[in-house]
């Protein structure tokens, strides 16, 4: 019984790497739905159906707790899953909760009225589906007032990263940052709202400038998971790490090894 980590592709490996560093003795089962990636251009219903299929596969593998290490799935499917699909003895958590907590400097269960926070102008870089869901804006509005969020749908970046074309990914990042800056010239902070994007964090930071605080999720999610498992020790897993993909295992293994710079072997899901 491992803790499951799900992503539409390989971006969730940034979260896996951080949680393995934070929780080195914890076994994880990682599932990449590479056959259907990217999710960011799909409809909300399609994302929901695909996410449920993959999470069910992790439940079948013995996971009682699954992390959606995919902002698109977290934004478009998580709430619906939690309300009507997840079994009572299982838990599914998303990745943007820790980010909202960090930005608003308050805990998720804090239901006090919205208040002013330190940042006023926030740039959001995410997939088209995440931007369309307005999930970040909605959750920020519940907790903070006076925050202007300008969203930039970053088409093509995930495809380039999944294909290993980092030169194209870098060019696309710079283009999307320039497009955002035409709408919001001087953001206080930037959200990398896709778990693929930390692989390009240095490029985002250079393009935005050193005065912009860039929020990247991996370490925030790792700390949040460690806290959650302390409060819910029954969800801690046992067993051996496993890597599963709906795509070609050899190809996905090579890409994952390139990303993490250590050998990762995927099997067919």
Curated annotation (Swiss-Prot):
Keyword Cell wall biogenesis/degradation assigned: yes
Gene3D superfamilies in the cross-refs: 3.40.50.1860
Catalytic activity: L-glutamate = D-glutamate
Entry superkingdom: Bacteria
Pathway(s) served: Cell wall biogenesis; peptidoglycan biosynthesis
Keyword Cell wall biogenesis/degradation recorded: yes
EC number: 5.1.1.3
Keyword set, alphabetical order: Cell shape, Cell wall biogenesis/degradation, Isomerase, Peptidoglycan synthesis
GO biological process, one term: regulation of cell shape
UniProt cross-references to Pfam families, sorted A to Z: Asp_Glu_race
Residues that, per the record, bind substrate: 7-8, 39-40, 71-72, 195-196
PROSITE patterns linked to this entry: ASP_GLU_RACEMASE_1 (PS00923)
Similarity comment text for this entry: Belongs to the aspartate/glutamate racemases family.
Role this protein plays: Provides the (R)-glutamate required for cell wall biosynthesis.
Name recorded for this polypeptide: Glutamate racemase
The organism of origin for this protein: Roseobacter denitrificans (strain ATCC 33942 / OCh 114)
């Amino acid at each position: 019984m491992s803790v499951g980590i799900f992503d539409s592709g390989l971006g969730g490996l940034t979260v896996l790497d951080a949680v393995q560093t934070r929780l080195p003795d914890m076994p994880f089962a990682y599932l990449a739905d590479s056959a259907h990636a990217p999710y960011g251009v799909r409809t909300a219903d399609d994302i929901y159906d695909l996410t449920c299929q993959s999470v069910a596969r992790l439940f079948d593998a013995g996971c009682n707790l699954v992390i959606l290490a995919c902002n698109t799935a977290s934004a478009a499917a998580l709430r619906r899953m939690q309300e009507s699909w997840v079994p009572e003895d299982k838990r599914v958590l998303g990745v943007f909760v820790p980010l909202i907590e960090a930005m608003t400097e308050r805990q998720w269960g804090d239901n006090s009225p919205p208040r002013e926070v330190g940042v006023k102008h926030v740039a959001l870089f995410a997939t088209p589906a995440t931007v369309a869901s307005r999930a970040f804006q909605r959750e920020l509005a519940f907790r903070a007032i006076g925050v202007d969020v300008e969203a930039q749908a970053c088409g093509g970046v995930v495809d380039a990263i999944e294909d290993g074309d980092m030169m194209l990914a870098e060019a696309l990042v710079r283009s999307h940052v320039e497009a955002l800056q035409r709408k919001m010239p001087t953001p206080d902070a930037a959200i990398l709202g896709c778990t693929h994007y930390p692989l390009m964090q240095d490029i985002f930071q250079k393009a935005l400038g050193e005065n912009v605080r860039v929020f990247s999720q991996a370490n925030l999610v790792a700390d949040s998971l460690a806290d959650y498992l302390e409060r819910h020790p029954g969800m801690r897993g046992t067993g051996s790490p496993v890597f599963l993909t709906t795509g070609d295992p050899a190809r996905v293994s090579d890409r994952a090894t390139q990303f993490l710079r250590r050998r990762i072997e995927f099997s067919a899901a």
